[in-house]
Regions:
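DNA-recognition alpha helix
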Residues: 113-131
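Major-groove recognition helix of helix-turn-helix-like DNA-binding domains
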Residues: 131-148
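Catalytic micro-motifs at enzyme active sites that drive phosphoryl/nucleotidyl and oxygen chemistry
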Residues: 129, 168-170, 197-199, 256
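Single, function-defining residue in the core of a domain
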Residues: 2-117, 146-148, 156-159, 174-178, ...
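A short, well-structured juxtamembrane/interface segment
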Residues: 162-169, 231-232
Length: 437
């Protein structure tokens, strides 16, 4: 793999390495390892099913805190008649807004562990009365995952993300306004999910592609494809103006860089260690940049060799950052970052790439803590609905608390929805979060 080769550094960079060693290497995991824990390419998602467990009996005592769903219902009510064109007889029992509320309940109530739990909970009078959910059989839940269009949920994500306020302010946040970390992450899929091709005919996985607003601490947009879906193409499809996209070297495509610029945005992206470039101007390294690990800052005449078509229409800058990881000779490994932002201080370019790790932490939250990797549907549309509702659940927590979602906050919400915590205790937890700076 190209990412495992030693970088071929030119004489200028080697000279800079020998002259300057970072006094305080960044502590972010991105600067100490090149392995993405959410996407280890050599490890296939396990296709085997866990041994069956006896179903958990759910009763009304297990369904507390449903008043929160009275706050959610207005968000979902416009979905009620969505995707009902086939229902000419007008006898549909389970509507889209009700299905969405049931999936959200799956995320917030730990008693409900899967489709059978959702089915059993939907039979309870209290759930039918307060959130207004209808009784749902396994068949109706399976049908809902096929017939309800997932796209309206992306619109809700956009509305909630727009309401989220920045959790980080200051000069750095102002200079890096619109900083958006972009990456993809795999969700294990079952062998019968033929649409979810990944690597070869034997493996199955879905992939979610997330745009994460770093300073809001919130996802802005998401799409779902099969495991082999092109991350670069999904980024092209989701581009917005006035964003500063920070991307890893999997997105290192010069035409994509130009597409980002053409969309009215900017980029900071890691390029491959053996990338060729022609220097136009060397920039001095300030003490602040040196402290951030920057060993070289230069404006390029072109990226790539003379044999490649120069697709970038404007000057591009290269910032080389030494990491805390060293090779066998004791020399620091380096990150070669490309950006069209000639105005940013070099230390801010390094910091922006360091912030890319925030999207990886969000993947861990979504899959391992919230439980999004436990798929409720086997078709692509159903997986999209579940992922989008997981994003909505995350955004709701952020809006309720004013902070990015954490395991402790989710636990407190689950205590409340399980009847172990009172409304007052939940409110006290939220107020404590708001008071914590």
């Amino acid at each position: 793999m190209p990412g495992n080769k030693r970088p071929k550094l030119d004489a200028q960079t080697l000279k800079a390495l020998n002259r300057a060693r970072p006094s305080a290497p960044p502590s972010n995991p991105e600067f100490t390892t090149n392995i993405d824990p959410t996407q280890q390419g050599d490890a296939a998602p396990s296709p085997s099913l866990p041994p069956p467990k006896p179903p958990t009996q759910i009763n009304a005592r297990d369904l507390k805190g449903l008043k929160y769903f009275n706050l959610i219902n207005p968000l979902l009510e416009h979905l009620h008649e969505c995707s009902t064109q086939r229902d000419r007889a007008g006898n549909r029992i389970l509507h889209y807004d009700q299905y969405a509320a049931l999936v959200l309940l799956f995320y917030f109530n730990p008693i409900i562990k899967g489709l059978r739990g959702i089915t059993q909970a939907s039979q309870l009078e209290r759930l039918q009365k307060e959130p207004g959910c209808s009784r749902a059989s396994l068949g109706s839940l399976s049908e809902a995952a096929r017939v309800f269009d997932a796209e309206p949920l992306r619109e809700i994500i956009g509305e909630l993300a727009h309401k989220a306020l920045p959790s980080t302010v200051g000069k750095e946040a102002e200079a890096l306004r619109g900083l958006t970390a972009v990456d993809g992450s795999l969700l294990p899929a079952l062998p019968k999910m033929a649409w979810a091709l990944w690597q070869d005919d034997e493996h199955r996985a879905a992939k979610m592609h997330v745009h994460f607003d770093v300073f809001k601490g919130a996802p802005m947009d998401v799409t779902v494809t099969h495991g082999s879906g092109s991350e670069n193409q999904q980024l092209r499809n989701m581009l917005l103006p006035k964003r500063l996209y920070v991307i890893d070297r999997g997105y290192a495509e010069y035409q994509l860089f130009q597409d980002i610029i053409d969309a009215g945005s900017s980029f900071i992206g890691r390029i491959k260690d053996n990338a060729a470039f022609e220097v136009l101007e060397e920039r001095p390294i300030t003490p602040e940049a040196k402290a951030a690990g920057v060993i070289r800052d230069a404006i390029m005449k072109r990226l790539g060799t003379e044999h490649h078509r120069n697709v970038l229409k404007q000057s591009v800058r290269i910032v080389i950052v030494a990491t805390s990881k060293t090779d066998s000779n004791g020399q620091p490994d380096v990150l070669i970052l490309a950006t069209d932002r000639l105005d940013l201080a070099a230390e801010l370019v390094a910091l922006a790439y360091k912030y890319r790790w925030s999207v990886e932490l969000f993947f861990r939250w979504l899959k391992c803590i919230l439980g999004c990797r436990h798929l409720l549907a086997t078709n692509q549309n159903g997986v999209e609905i579940q992922v989008y509702l997981g994003i909505i659940a995350s955004l709701l927590i952020s809006l309720w608390t004013g902070k990015k979602p954490t395991q402790r906050t989710l636990e407190m919400l689950q205590f409340y929805f399980s009847g172990w915590a009172t409304w007052e205790e939940l409110q006290a937890h939220i107020e404590k979060l708001k008071d914590h700076k």
